[in-house]
Amino acid sequence: GQIKLAQLHLGRAEFGGVPTNLQREMENAGVLIRLNTSVDPDLARETVPDIVVIATGALPYPAEIEGLEEAHVVNAWQVLKGQANIGGRVVIADWRCDWIGMGLAELMARNGCHVRLAVNGMTAGQTIPQYALDAWLATLHELGVEIISHIRLLGIDAEDAYFQHTLNSHSVVLSEVDLF
C-alpha cells in the first residue's frame, strides 16, 4: 500500500511497478497468495505452510499535539492522494527527517505554496543518502522552501505553529500558516 503512495511523490514513478513485479516474482516462485483472510491456528493446521507472511497494511501516523481541533491539519497521505485542501502558506513538521517531508515540500512548492519545512534533526532529509540529499536540498532551495532545523512541534492554533528548539529549548513560532 505504501509503495502506491511513494509513487505519487515527484520523480518517484518507478515505485509504481514494484507491486506488479513482486506479484509476478511470487507467481513464478509458486507462492500461494491469500488476500483478506483471517489467520488462525485452524488455517495453519489445514494448509501446513512453510512460511507465513502477514501484511497488515498501514495507517497514517496520527499527530498528537495541542490545537488540532483549531487548525487546518492534513497528513501526507491526503496530500499525495489529492484529498487535501491546501492553502498558500504551509508548514510541514517532519520529525523523521526523511523522504516524506522533502517530497511534500517539493510538491507543494511546485504547486505555488510558500513552504516552511520544520525538522527536528540537523537538516531536512538527514536520513537520505548524501548523493541524493544534496541535489534535493538544492532543488528545495531553488523553489524557495524555507528549511528550519532543530525544532520539534509542540502545538498549533488557527494561524500559528509552536515549536521548541531541540538544542536550547527556546520557543519558536511560525506565524501566518494556512495548513499544517
Model-predicted segments: where are they?
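Short acidic/His/Gly/Ser-rich catalytic and metal-binding motifs that mark active-site loops
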Residues: G1-I3, P62-A63
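Short glycine-enriched, charge-decorated loop/helix-capping segments at active-site entrances
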Residues: L5-R12
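A Rossmann-like FAD-binding core segment of flavoenzymes
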Residues: F15-Y61, E70, N75-K81, N85-I86, ...
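Beta-rich extracellular carbohydrate-active architectures
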Residues: E66-G67
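Beta1/beta-strand and adjacent pyrophosphate-binding region of the FAD-binding site
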Residues: I86-D98
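N-terminal Rossmann-fold NAD(P) dinucleotide-binding loop
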Residues: G101
